[in-house]
């Protein structure tokens, strides 16, 4: 369900300690970035479990990003930052390199005319390549949408990414033990299988 637009969201975010306002913003190798974080359910739990690591939730819609701010306050997090930069402009707004980027339950944009909006379209993958440090850095994706997952697999391969791990059933894989389940996953895990992959940029990226 889409959130009703909150016209005060951006001004509230601008007053928040952990909202990134000044760019370019310097990221570090051990920072964890999540692109299209939505309400921040997964990244907030990751930040809670790893208090000595910095996390950056990138969500372009202020109304949605405000939900992340609320989670930060509720959990008393000191290591989760919010950015409302559009994912198509990451290379213009961030300097430095990271070893980890996540996409979690991204909008699949199923209609063909919306292909360029999918977060695994070539132009977005190029942005992630720019931010990832090297071929040992990891790009993680999990989704319950099979069509989006298959599209992402094809797009990654066509754009010179290496697939390190691929499964159509995350909860019955070797990565289930470390997987942080969102409320959606917990609610539907008996009925819906979660697709998951780990990729890295190719040698010539």
Curated annotation (Swiss-Prot):
Pathway membership: tRNA modification; N(7)-methylguanine-tRNA biosynthesis
Keywords attached to this Swiss-Prot or TrEMBL record, sorted alphabetically, are: Methyltransferase, S-adenosyl-L-methionine, Transferase, tRNA processing
Task: Kindly give the InterPro entries that the UniProt entry links to this protein.
Answer: SAM-dependent_MTases_sf, tRNA_(Gua-N-7)_MeTrfase_Trmb, tRNA_methyltr_TrmB_bact
**UniProt keyword annotation of tRNA processing present:** yes
Residue ranges annotated as coiled coil are none
Question: Which GO molecular function entries does the Swiss-Prot or TrEMBL record give?
Answer: tRNA (guanine(46)-N7)-methyltransferase activity
> What highest taxon heads this organism's lineage?
Bacteria
Name the chemical reaction catalysed here: guanosine(46) in tRNA + S-adenosyl-L-methionine = N(7)-methylguanosine(46) in tRNA + S-adenosyl-L-homocysteine
Interaction with RNA: where is this region? 113-118
Q: Which family does it belong to?
A: Belongs to the class I-like SAM-binding methyltransferase superfamily. TrmB family.
**Free-text function comment from the UniProt entry:** Catalyzes the formation of N(7)-methylguanine at position 46 (m7G46) in tRNA.
Protein name per UniProt: tRNA (guanine-N(7)-)-methyltransferase
Originating organism: Mycoplasmopsis synoviae (strain 53) (Mycoplasma synoviae)
């Amino acid at each position: 369900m889409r959130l009703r637009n909150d016209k005060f969201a951006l001004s509230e975010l601008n007053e928040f300690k952990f909202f990134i306002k000044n760019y370019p913003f310097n990221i570090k190798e051990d920072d964890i970035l999540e692109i299209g974080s939505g309400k921040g359910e997964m990244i907030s739990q990751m930040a809670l479990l790893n208090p000595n690591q910095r996390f950056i939730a990138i969500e372009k819609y202020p109304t949605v990003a405000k939900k992340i701010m609320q989670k930060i306050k509720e959990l008393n997090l000191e290591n989760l930052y919010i950015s409302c930069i559009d994912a198509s402009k990451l290379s213009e707004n961030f300097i430095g390199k990271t070893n980890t980027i996540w996409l979690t339950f991204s909008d699949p944009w199923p209609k063909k005319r919306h292909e360029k909006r999918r977060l695994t379209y070539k132009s977005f993958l190029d942005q992630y390549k720019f931010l990832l440090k090297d071929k040992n850095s990891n790009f993680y994706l999990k989704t319950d949408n099979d069509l989006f997952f298959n599209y992402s697999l094809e797009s990654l391969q066509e754009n010179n990414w290496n697939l390190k791990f691929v499964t159509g059933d995350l909860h019955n894989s070797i990565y289930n033990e470390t997987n942080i389940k969102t409320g959606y996953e917990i609610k539907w895990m008996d009925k819906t299988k979660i697709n998951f992959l780990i990729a890295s940029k190719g040698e010539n990226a």
